[in-house]
């Protein structure tokens, strides 16, 4: 990203050194607002016909993609529990709070600004705020204070019952997995719905581990590739983006033995055989996908969380 910005600042409008990149939502917004990306090409790819357009493939962190990004994988915030320990998991923020009170010290979340920790804050915010439509736009100070008030009230109630009484937080989801395996925690968190399946296969989680989410839905997103406006080989970049959408590539990528990255294809649009294979590699019984807040909320949430809870 820095290279693209540097070349633009130097006036290099053609012959750029970057042809295709995997970009996150915050960086996409930055590049798009600066007019540094090609637009209108993604849905012209031949393999777009297989894409599941019920997924958020036309927006990235609530920013319309306008054909400037091609999807190639999905993700969704997902809880993990052990069926032998937690056969009935919490299904709402309120029942999660009740679960934590009933099982003190066994619930936690990764310390923001860890990506998954911040996603957990976003998840709670979406479900607790009385004004979810405000999350579609970047916040100003007044909006932020009003919309997030229920979140901080909830966390103030939750934290005393967390692992280490909410005075310390795991640095990563991997640390949570280890604590779940050791039976210290009752829940772990991931942003890959296939994560539990992968970790069971590798022996990093017990065979009784399973994925679940809140009944109303869990936030999810799509990861994309994009082409800089000054790309030197944009035609070749589109060939690669199209390959990433091919059924063969998506099936291999979805294989837990290879990566286990969720597909962005609609199984019903695939030929027999490929359809069944893809369905077998997709986690079952996932909750609905909730759109993420606008990218402008991320840093604001992280900074306020650190101000309130990060000095323990």
Locations of regions flagged by a protein language model:
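Short, hydrophobic alpha-helical packing/hinge segments within bilobed ligand-binding/sensory domains
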Residues: 1, 28, 176-177, 237
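Mature extracytoplasmic/periplasmic domains
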Residues: 218-219, 223-289
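Extracytoplasmic ligand-binding site segments that recognize negatively charged/polar headgroups
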Residues: 18, 24-174
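A ligand-binding cleft/hinge motif common to bilobed small-molecule-binding domains
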Residues: 28-30, 187-206
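Hydrophobic residues within well-ordered alpha-helices
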Residues: 4, 31, 176-181, 227
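Early extracytoplasmic/lumenal segment of secretory-pathway proteins
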Residues: 1-30
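Periplasmic-binding protein-like
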Residues: 61, 75, 154-158, 205-226
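Conserved C-terminal helix/tail region of periplasmic/extracytoplasmic solute-binding proteins
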Residues: 178, 283-312
């Amino acid at each position: 990203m820095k290279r693209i910005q540097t070349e633009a600042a130097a006036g290099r409008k053609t012959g750029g050194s970057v042809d295709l990149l995997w970009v996150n939502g915050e960086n996409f917004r930055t590049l798009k607002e600066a007019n540094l990306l090609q637009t209108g090409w993604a849905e012209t790819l031949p393999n777009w016909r297989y894409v599941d357009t019920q997924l958020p493939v036309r927006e990235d962190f609530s920013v319309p993609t306008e054909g400037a990004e091609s999807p190639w994988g999905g993700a969704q915030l997902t809880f993990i529990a052990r069926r032998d320990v937690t056969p009935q998991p919490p299904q709402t923020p309120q029942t999660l709070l009740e679960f934590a009170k009933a099982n003190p010290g066994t619930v936690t979340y990764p310390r923001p600004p860890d990506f998954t920790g911040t996603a957990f804050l976003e998840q709670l915010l979406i479900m607790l705020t009385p004004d979810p439509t405000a999350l579609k736009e970047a916040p100003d100070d007044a909006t932020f204070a009003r919309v997030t008030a229920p979140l901080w009230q909830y966390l103030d109630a939750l934290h005393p019952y967390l692992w280490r009484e909410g005075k310390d937080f795991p640095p990563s989801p991997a640390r949570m997995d280890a604590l779940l395996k050791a039976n210290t925690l009752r829940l772990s968190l991931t942003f890959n719905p296939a994560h539990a399946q992968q970790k069971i296969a590798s022996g990093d989680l017990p065979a009784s581990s399973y994925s679940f989410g809140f009944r109303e839905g869990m936030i999810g997103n799509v990861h994309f590739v994009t082409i800089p406006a000054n790309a030197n080989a944009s035609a070749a970049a589109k060939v690669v983006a199209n390959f990433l959408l091919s059924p063969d590539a998506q099936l291999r990528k979805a294989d837990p033995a290879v990566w286990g990255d969720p597909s962005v294809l609609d199984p019903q649009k695939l030929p027999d055989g490929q359809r069944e294979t893809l369905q077998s590699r997709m986690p079952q019984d996932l909750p609905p996908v909730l759109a993420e807040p606008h990218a402008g909320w991320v840093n604001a949430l992280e900074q306020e969380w650190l101000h309130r809870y990060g000095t323990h």
